[in-house]
Amino acid sequence: MDLSKLTTEARNKRTMNLDRMTIHEFATIMNQEDQSVPLSVANSLATIENAIDSITKHFKQGGRLFYIGAGTSGRLGVLDAVECVPTFGIEAEMVRGLIAGGPSAMTLAVEGAEDDDKLASSDLKKRALTAADVVVGIAASGRTPYVIGGLDYADSLGAATISLACNQNSEISKHAQIAIEVPVGPEILTGSTRLKAGTAQKLVLNMLSTGAMVGIGKVYKNLMVDVRPTNEKLLIRSKRIICQATNCDEATAAEVFEKADRNVKLAIVMILTNLPKKEANEQLRKADGFISKTIPE
């Protein structure tokens, strides 16, 4: 394995004296390096847009989204996946994050897991992957065997495949139908890809999941109308969203929220259309979940 050609493994010329910097110097240089990350992501927007479009189309056909990765890359996939459940009110199976080595690898490194190119296919088989699904392989280096094996298995079934790497001309790009490459350059701490590379990956994953959820009607204007009120904060937010979407007062929001069985989206449609719950729910069904399509012009 030759790591010398990977920019994520190169030494950063700006931080050769990192161990002798003052805290102010360290914080300043790290902040400056981090500012380059969104610009790198911006250079890949066209490919990211293609990926969002693909995920959205598969969601509309009942497909699922799987993130696969090892180490930090895998953890970021799991993080994005689990947040989709309360944010967009989806079932946990719709977006899943798989990490090399299984759940225990979220907190402890599992030796050899990322180098096993058969492990991801086994993980995906357990989830009954089909051609209707999408697999996003995440690897900062762009050469992780676990990810490559998973992408190849997905492709063999006819599933959509997307890769996300932080090096140009990466190996995993050759194994995906849509290849996202966000080269962030050398880290301030050589080879520590949890830094700029991890930040870039998180930014892209945010775009993939959020963009696709917008595309299937999980958002009204810029409000998360399918949020699940699973705690006190989200309960308060749910009522606030109803007020913001309909310009109603808090008392009305609270009343209709309960009538709608604490379904934010349904409550909004009931208020905007002045329909009772059953009819409002039917309007939402006909509109494929898009609130904007239920409102008379």
Swiss-Prot record:
PROSITE patterns in UniProt: GCKR, SIS
* Transmembrane regions listed in the UniProt entry: none
What CDD domains would the database entry show?
SIS_Etherase
The GO annotation for biological process reads:
amino sugar catabolic process; N-acetylmuramic acid catabolic process; peptidoglycan turnover
**EC number(s) stated in the UniProt entry for this protein:** 4.2.1.126
Catalysed reaction(s) here are: N-acetyl-D-muramate 6-phosphate + H2O = N-acetyl-D-glucosamine 6-phosphate + (R)-lactate
Annotated NCBIfam families: N-acetylmuramic acid 6-phosphate etherase (TIGR00274), PRK05441.1 (NF003915), PRK12570.1 (NF009222)
| Assembly mode | Homodimer.
- What is this protein's record name? N-acetylmuramic acid 6-phosphate etherase
